Amino acid sequence: MPAPTTTLLIEGTFTELADEFAQYIDALRKNEGASLQSEIAPLIEPLRQQEQSEEEPDRKQRDEVLKKLVGAAAVLNAAPEKEIISAYNLLVHLVHQASNPDMFLSRICTYLAKPITTSPQFGPTLAISILSTIFNTLAPTDSSRFHVLLAIVAVIRQSGSSYAFEALKPQLAAQLPTWLSAWELDDEDAQKLHLAVADAAQASGDLELAQTHVVQALQTIPANESSSKEARDLAVRALTSALKSPGVFDFTSLTAADAIQALRSSDSTLFELLEIFTADTLDAYEDFIAATPLETISGGVLADGAEALQTKMRLLTLASLAASTPSRSLPYATIASALRVPVEDVEKWVIDTIRAGLVEGKLSQLRSEFLVHRATYRVFGEKQWAEVQGRLMVWRRSLESVLGVLRTERERYIRESMQAAAEETGQGKSGDKGAKGGDRRRNPQQQQQSQPSQPQQAREVELVGGAE
């Protein structure tokens, strides 16, 4: 897989290696047609003289030699398995000495995207290895990497190897946005790459990633081309895939695309179905299907998705129901009625909706209700803002009530503490007067016994006040 930039180390001058490569091609051809070595001999002779005299090589002359070599290189796919990698590496080394390697590399990539006939089992692995080497010999900003990556993805798609695609996925996730920016691709090439990745992901069974790249390809379509046939076909593909995909519940990125909005005119029933899945419930969906069978929508692209669509619509309906319930408690009977399912199946549908990430909560079998902790809003408009405002007002009133209780209790505590302190002070003064008048009548032991009783009474009053 693509990795940091590397360098091919191959000994020999350009003319020596070109002559060697031509001999190898002639051997693979088995004397069929004109000899490649004899064809390039007149072309490499001036270059050989330049090399011997250590003059600056004529790159245009090299290009003429490379045109012959690269044009005949398709036969490399019939080379012995153990020689294929070294033969292609030699050709890549020669191509890097051209005035413009890009014009040759794209053709080499097309060869490698085709089957390697001498190794049906390991051909894709060999091709990916060679293409990865080519990719890594190019500078990170070299736009030729685009053609190489396209070829890598094409080989993976044709092979159907989920292992190879899994090895490529981390690179796509971490590097693809950076590559697209560095290569400065136009919208058409960016779309081509996203669709190639989507096809490879679908072939390997990763439908979620395939859908992601189809949507990204859709977003490359300029607004002034959103009504073209190509844009319409891609929009129908993206929308159909999203509706049938079991993991797609957010259609925001689709509805924001100009090409999807253009379906309002070209495929009005398909666009109407999108609007139902975006904001409506099962009742509206079933009314729509009764009037517009799936087989009649956009050439029947959804004809095989009836069950998947109904399942998704039930999950979305439950999410809307949970989000719009003020009490945050949904009786089983209410859910069963909204989803058109038996009451005994309610728990299954709630669990499926939780797994889809649309709601969070707890099932209460004892009370036959679903306690909603969190619910996803499918759309967030004026109605939803009003609901949020209402809930915030309820929360505010609740907090104000709690604050009022705390304020009242604090004031009562302060008042009672002050009263207790005043009583303690008054009792202390009366005790001092009694002690002065009774000194002559009491012995010291009696004085010591009588004095502690007064602070003890004050502490009891203070404790009672604090407890209250």
From Swiss-Prot:
Protein's job: Component of the eukaryotic translation initiation factor 3 (eIF-3) complex, which is involved in protein synthesis of a specialized repertoire of mRNAs and, together with other initiation factors, stimulates binding of mRNA and methionyl-tRNAi to the 40S ribosome. The eIF-3 complex specifically targets and initiates translation of a subset of mRNAs involved in cell proliferation.
Record-linked Pfam families: eIF3m_C_helix (PF18005), PCI (PF01399)
Gene Ontology biological process terms in this record: formation of cytoplasmic translation initiation complex
Domain PCI intervals: 206-377
Region described as Disordered: spans on this chain: 42-61, 418-468
Family as reported in the entry's similarity comment: Belongs to the eIF-3 subunit M family.
Organism for this UniProt entry: Neosartorya fischeri (strain ATCC 1020 / DSM 3700 / CBS 544.65 / FGSC A1164 / JCM 1740 / NRRL 181 / WB 181)
Predominant location category: cytoplasm
Subunit field text: Component of the eukaryotic translation initiation factor 3 (eIF-3) complex.
Biased composition (Basic and acidic residues): 430-442
Annotated GO MF terms: translation initiation factor activity
Low complexity bias (residue ranges): 444-457
Record protein name field: Eukaryotic translation initiation factor 3 subunit M
Protein origin, superkingdom: Eukaryota
Keywords: Cytoplasm, Initiation factor, Protein biosynthesis
Gene Ontology terms: cellular component: eukaryotic 43S preinitiation complex; eukaryotic 48S preinitiation complex; eukaryotic translation initiation factor 3 complex, eIF3m
Subcellular locations according to the entry: Cytoplasm
